């Protein structure tokens, strides 16, 4: 049975270890070799392991008889002293490999120096290859140098990084000791690369738009406020790039996309971080139906490219991205999950208020029927959408930038994609009527004056751009962090952000 030390004892022991390591560093400084910077690495652990993986071909005898030598560097992750011969493991970005260190091969002085190394130190080694009695490929070290002295000990294999908050605060330690965490961020990079490759192949142009806005817009969200000293001007960190991207469509860039950070001054949860990554794209002469097709295919192809499968497990749910995604009108979905409601009632504010009261849903007196319908949807439907589902045809009231439906007044050509009860994407046929957009902006201004701090501002320059004429356009926004959560099976957005927002340590 492993005895776990109390936190105070662990802290005391850690301080003692740090003091011991500082003393070793002081001795190295006295020798003038504290932090050498003249090492050339030529080989990586995973490459060496793969090249000599065949145990029958590469026996200990054939390896030692060969002329193969490696020059490697990495972090010392384990050390086992055994008299005149010892074993160790180093870890580089590709993986780990075992070291066989013998005093008669390395030399007595170097062997003595190895014995006082600490786990966590970064070292360089050279040597031939061999295989142990258990069949493990090993570097038979004849040159060893300390490159970086680690002053703080890594979490031991018993305690580890059990404090989740510490994992987020000290991601540098988490990446060293948690292979699963490292793999998530490698996959994240591959997912973003796959999205770019998919869009580039379809002749979308990647662009960059401002991160600081004079007028925040493009989403119903509370912005962060900053200040430009030289211009004596209040600015806002962007909540979305939408209005700038659509200006580019006006300018004739008919297929554009941007993958970048957005900032929203809102709550923090397992699904929300104040800064997050979004993919937004716009395609001229496209409708929301075609954008749904695009989103579905892109997500499916990205999963297949990165994972080799379209089936994933997310928070205990088996998700299949292979079949055609369901498409379901918001009012029909609400009525399906609330049989006491009729589709006709979905546009009746008084009826919706009664249903909200019955369902104990808190609403504001300023809500119109659109917001009330959304409130019922969020309370009774959203969490049930496990398999990929497009919820379509949102009310105009909650969609100030979307084109109103030609078929049904009060609704828009808009969709949101839900998977396992979480919103992954949002898109619509863009509103390109400048006069209608101006009226919608004015209603947003009135809502803001009425206390809605997430309502949009009036953007006169965007209206001016629309007055030059924007082609019929479809737009899409995908929450990249949530997509990464889906494809890595992560249950918290903090698990897929290298440095998630945390309150400062006291």
From Swiss-Prot:
Q: Name one GO molecular function term.
A: lysine-tRNA ligase activity
Specify which residues bind Mg(2+) 1 according to the UniProt entry for this protein: 416, 423
Paste the cofactor note: Binds 3 Mg(2+) ions per subunit.
Q: Which residues form the signal peptide?
A: none
Asked whether the keyword Aminoacyl-tRNA synthetase is assigned, the reply is yes
Gene Ontology cellular-component annotations: cytosol
Question: Pfam families, alphabetically?
Answer: tRNA-synt_2 (PF00152), tRNA_anti-codon (PF01336)
User: Which cell locations does it reside in?
Assistant: Cytoplasm
Q: What is this protein called?
A: Lysine--tRNA ligase
Catalytic activity field: tRNA(Lys) + L-lysine + ATP = L-lysyl-tRNA(Lys) + AMP + diphosphate
Q: Which Cys-Cys disulfides exist here?
A: none
């Amino acid at each position: 049975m492993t005895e776990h030390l109390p936190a105070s004892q662990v802290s005391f022991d850690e301080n003692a270890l740090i003091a011991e390591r500082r003393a070793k560093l002081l001795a190295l400084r006295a020798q003038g070799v504290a932090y050498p910077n003249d090492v050339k690495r030529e080989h990586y652990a995973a490459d060496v392991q793969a090249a000599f993986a065949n145990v029958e071909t590469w026996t200990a005898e054939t390896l030692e008889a060969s002329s193969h030598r490696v020059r490697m560097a990495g972090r010392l992750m384990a050390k086992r002293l055994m008299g005149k011969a010892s074993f160790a493991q180093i870890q580089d970005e590709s993986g780990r490999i075992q070291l066989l260190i013998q005093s008669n091969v390395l030399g007595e002085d170097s062997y003595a120096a190895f014995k006082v190394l600490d786990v966590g130190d970064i070292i360089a080694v050279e040597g031939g290859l061999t295989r142990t009695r258990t069949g493990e490929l090993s570097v038979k070290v004849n040159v060893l140098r300390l490159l970086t002295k680690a002053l703080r000990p890594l979490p031991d294999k018993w305690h580890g990084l059990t404090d989740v908050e510490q994992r987020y605060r000290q991601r540098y330690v988490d990446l060293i000791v948690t292979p699963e965490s490292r793999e998530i961020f490698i996959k994240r990079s591959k997912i973003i690369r796959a999205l770019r490759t998919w869009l580039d192949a379809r002749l979308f142009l990647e662009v960059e738009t401002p991160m600081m806005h004079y007028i925040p817009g493009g989403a119903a969200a509370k912005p962060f406020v900053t200040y430009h000293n030289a211009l004596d001007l209040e600015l806002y960190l962007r909540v979305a790039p939408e209005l700038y991207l659509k200006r580019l469509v006006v300018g004739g860039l008919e297929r554009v996309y941007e993958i970048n950070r957005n900032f929203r001054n809102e709550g923090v949860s397992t699904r929300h971080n104040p800064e997050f990554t979004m993919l937004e794209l716009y395609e001229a002469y496209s409708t929301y139906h075609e954008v749904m097709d695009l989103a579905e295919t892109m997500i499916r192809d990205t999963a297949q490219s990165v994972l080799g499968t379209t089936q994933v497990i997310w928070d205990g749910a088996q998700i299949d991205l292979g079949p055609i995604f369901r498409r379901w009108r918001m009012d029909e979905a609400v009525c399906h999950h609330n049989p006491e409601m009729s589709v006709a009632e979905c546009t009746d504010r008084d009826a919706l208020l009664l249903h909200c009261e019955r369902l104990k849903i808190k609403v504001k007196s300023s809500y119109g029927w659109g917001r009330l319908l959304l409130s019922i949807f969020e309370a009774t439907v959203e969490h049930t959408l496990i398999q990929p589902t497009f919820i379509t045809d949102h009310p105009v009231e909650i969609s100030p930038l979307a084109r109103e439906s030609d078929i049904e007044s009060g609704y828009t050509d808009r969709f949101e994609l839900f998977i396992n009860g979480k919103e992954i994407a949002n898109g619509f046929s863009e509103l390109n009527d400048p006069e209608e957009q101006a009226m919608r902006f004015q209603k947003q201004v009135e809502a803001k004056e009425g206390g809605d701090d997430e309502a949009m501002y009036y953007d006169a320059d965007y209206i001016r751009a629309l007055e030059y004429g924007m082609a019929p356009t479809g737009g899409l926004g995908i929450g990249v962090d949530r997509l990464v959560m889906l494809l890595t099976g992560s249950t918290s957005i903090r698990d897929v952000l290298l440095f998630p927002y945390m309150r400062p340590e006291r």
